[in-house]
């Protein structure tokens, strides 16, 4: 694995000197926060004249018009022609494309993928769970997480073979999930008071996990996890919070803005500890 520049200096700095190739780099956040724009900007930043970008688009966010507009704005007109977009309407289609078709097409067309993007990894996963009766949710979730793991493993192997950057997006867990976690902590604490065996040690200590949808296996596999959040600085200014990284300290933040160029640095391009980043927002609000 090597590291490559994302084309956004402040993001390179956040990740400790660039984004890892041959490994899963995960971005998650609330709907509409800019995850697709971030992936698009990084992918186009990685793509040179000889390379290509392969995208598995499950949410119809990678439109030809949008791609062409970003390429024009960043001074790379026509580079959108190097982006190969696959679209899936079901989990079964997503599985087939991720685990088989992309690899076959790369080999048969002699593409040189600089980036592989799965945006998002969890749209069909979430939709499938919503349609499952409550009594079968646990078993259905395990089944879907298993399929998702196979897909991610296939793409990691592919990215490793071509020394490509692999990015995937996920969604933020709902408030219902947070309430369930709070209830679990209370139950575990009660078990401890009654001197019963405590199996969930993390729950007993109130440990905070990753707030993303898709199961813990995705979090385990990822070499970097960025949570993207809206801020009160401006509607187009977002915070990128580094929650996991093998190359850099976590709980650090950079601010970026969304415009016609996709994602660019906001203000002074500087990596901040979480406490300082929060202070910046509070200072702007006064």
Question: How should these model regions be labeled?
Answer:
Residues 25-27, 54-56, 84-86, 167, ...:
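Hydrophobic/aromatic beta-strand patches that form the interior of the parallel beta-sheet core
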Residues 146, 153, 157-280:
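Phosphate-binding/switch region of NTP-binding enzymes
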Residues 5-8, 12, 21, 64, ...:
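Amphipathic alpha-helical transducer elements in NTP-driven molecular machines
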Residues 115-120, 124-137, 141-169, 176:
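Aromatic-anchored, glycine/proline-accented short structural segments
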Residues 1-79, 283-285:
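The Walker A/P-loop phosphate-binding site
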Residues 11, 27, 67, 83, ...:
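Conserved RecA-like P-loop NTPase ATPase core
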Residues 50-140:
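Conserved inter-motif catalytic segment of the P-loop NTP-binding fold
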Residues 17-19, 45-49, 75-78, 104-111, ...:
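Conserved catalytic network of the ASCE P-loop NTPase/AAA+ motor domain
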């Amino acid at each position: 694995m090597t590291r490559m520049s994302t084309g956004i200096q402040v993001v390179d700095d956040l990740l400790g000197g660039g984004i890892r190739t041959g490994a899963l780099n995960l971005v998650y956040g609330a709907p509409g926060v800019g995850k697709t724009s971030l992936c698009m900007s990084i992918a186009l930043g990685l793509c040179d004249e000889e390379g290509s970008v392969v995208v598995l688009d499950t949410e119809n966010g990678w439109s030809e018009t949008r791609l062409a507009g970003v390429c024009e704005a960043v001074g790379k007109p026509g580079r959108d022609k190097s982006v190969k977009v696959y679209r899936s309407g079901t989990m079964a289609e997503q599985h087939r494309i991720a685990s088989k078709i992309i690899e076959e097409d790369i080999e048969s067309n002699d593409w040189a993928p600089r980036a592989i993007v799965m945006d998002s990894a969890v749209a069909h996963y979430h939709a499938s769970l919503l349609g499952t009766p409550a009594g079968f949710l646990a078993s259905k979730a395990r089944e879907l997480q298993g399929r998702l793991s196979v897909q991610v493993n296939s793409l990691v192997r592919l990215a490793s073979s071509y020394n490509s950057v692999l990015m995937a997006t996920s969604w933020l867990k709902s408030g219902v999930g947070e309430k369930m976690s709070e209830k679990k902590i209370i139950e575990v604490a009660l078990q401890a008071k009654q001197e019963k065996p405590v199996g969930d040690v993390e729950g007993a200590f109130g440990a905070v996990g990753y707030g993303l949808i898709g199961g813990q296996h995705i979090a385990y596999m990822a070499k970097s996890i960025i949570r993207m959040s809206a801020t009160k600085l401006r509607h187009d200014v977002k915070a990128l919070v580094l929650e996991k990284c093998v190359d850099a300290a976590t709980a650090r933040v950079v601010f970026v803005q969304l415009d016609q160029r996709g994602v660019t640095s906001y203000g002074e391009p500087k990596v901040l500890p979480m406490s300082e980043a929060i202070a910046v927002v509070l200072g702007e609000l006064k």
